[in-house]
């Protein structure tokens, strides 16, 4: 592999480790020319997940878009980004485990709601109101009464 510092063509590996549940290989490399060290990561190239939108359009799954939606739901709640990232990781793993390459945005929304229900009731209601397109106070009241019963 080419050295990012001096451009020398032939670097060598000094350490190799598996990370992220053995899905990524981290390699520590050294350049014999300039003696600088650097890290590379080797990942399995997975088939992209396509999301089928409400209007029938298909677009690639966007982790950042889902993260932004979760962040809006947890505004001013004591929930750190690591928990949100873990939710997204679990959802992606669940989709991959099913062996599907296409999923509706509605199904993703259901998965998010299941995770938020266990994490934070306020975030759950916020996300549900957008995901289920609430247009009246009655819809909020109905959701809240269902939550009280559970």
UniProtKB/Swiss-Prot annotation:
Superkingdom classification of source: Bacteria
Cofactor(s) of this protein: Zn(2+)
Zinc finger (unnamed): 3-34
Domain ATP-cone, residue spans: 49-139
A molecular function (GO) term: DNA binding
Transcription regulation found in the keyword field: yes
Family from the record: Belongs to the NrdR family.
InterPro entries attached to this UniProt entry: ATP-cone_dom (IPR005144), NrdR-like_N (IPR055173), RNR_NrdR-like (IPR003796)
Protein name: Transcriptional repressor NrdR
Entry keywords, A to Z: ATP-binding, DNA-binding, Metal-binding, Nucleotide-binding, Repressor, Transcription, Transcription regulation, Zinc, Zinc-finger
Cofactor note: Binds 1 zinc ion.
Role, per record: Negatively regulates transcription of bacterial ribonucleotide reductase nrd genes and operons by binding to NrdR-boxes.
Pfam families: ATP-cone, Zn_ribbon_NrdR
Signal sequence range: none
NCBIfam families for the chain: transcriptional regulator NrdR
Annotated source species: Dictyoglomus thermophilum (strain ATCC 35947 / DSM 3960 / H-6-12)
Gene Ontology process terms (BP): negative regulation of DNA-templated transcription
């Amino acid at each position: 592999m080419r050295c990012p510092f001096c451009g020398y063509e032939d670097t060598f590996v000094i350490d190799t480790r598996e990370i992220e549940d053995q899905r990524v290989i981290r390699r520590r490399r050294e350049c014999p020319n300039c003696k600088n060290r650097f890290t590379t990561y080797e990942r399995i190239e997975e088939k992209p997940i396509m999301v089928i939108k409400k209007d029938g359009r298909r677009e690639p799954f966007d982790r950042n878009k889902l993260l932004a939606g979760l962040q809006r739901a947890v505004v001013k709640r004591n929930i750190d980004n690591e928990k949100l990232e873990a939710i997204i990781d679990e959802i992606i793993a669940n989709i991959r485990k099913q062996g599907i390459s296409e999923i509706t945005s509605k199904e993703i929304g259901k998965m998010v709601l299941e995770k938020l229900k266990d994490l934070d009731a306020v975030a759950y209601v916020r996300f549900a109101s957008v995901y289920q397109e609430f247009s009246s106070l009655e819809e909020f009241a109905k959701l809240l009464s269902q939550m009280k019963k559970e």
